[in-house]
């Protein structure tokens, strides 16, 4: 059984990687299209240049960034990026399925809270729950 070839809106990864940013903007969802048409910010351009430099030199090092608003582009596939979530850096390996999303979508800023059982040391409202 062969694995299915990745396609993004009808284009293969190789076709996407050969497109310019303007051509790519027409394929992307509206939110990212707007970001690309207006031009990437200076910080996002610096991050993209760093990713390109690391790929050209063959460096397989994790790139740390606070840029959660950076759209994931086809040329970023295969890179390892650590995105800051407000407390720590969350390491992400970019795969083709992530194209068309933002880096911040893969670094959650809040955790699911698991509350303890009521009783000793709990909140004031559960102070009077009988202990076993």
Curated annotation (Swiss-Prot):
Domain of life, source organism: Archaea
Gene3D superfamilies tied to this protein: 30s Ribosomal Protein S19, Chain A
Keyword set includes Ribonucleoprotein: yes
GO terms of biological process kind: ribosomal small subunit assembly; translation
One MF annotation (Gene Ontology) recorded for this entry: structural constituent of ribosome
Family: Belongs to the universal ribosomal protein uS19 family.
The protein's name: Small ribosomal subunit protein uS19
Organism: Korarchaeum cryptofilum (strain OPF8)
């Amino acid at each position: 059984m062969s694995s299915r070839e990745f396609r993004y809106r009808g284009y293969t990864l190789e076709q996407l990687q050969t497109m310019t940013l303007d051509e790519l903007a027409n394929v992307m969802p509206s939110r990212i299209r707007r970001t690309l048409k207006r031009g990437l910010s200076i910080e996002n351009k610096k991050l993209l240049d760093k990713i390109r430099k690391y790929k050209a030199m063959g460096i397989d090092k994790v790139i740390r960034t606070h840029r959660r608003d950076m759209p994931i582009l086809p040329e970023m596939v295969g890179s390892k990026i650590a995105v800051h979530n407000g407390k720590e850096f969350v390491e992400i390996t970019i795969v083709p399925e992530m194209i068309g999303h933002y880096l911040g979508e893969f670094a959650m800023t809040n955790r699911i809270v698991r509350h303890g059982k009521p009783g000793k040391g709990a909140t004031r409202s559960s102070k009077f729950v009988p202990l076993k």
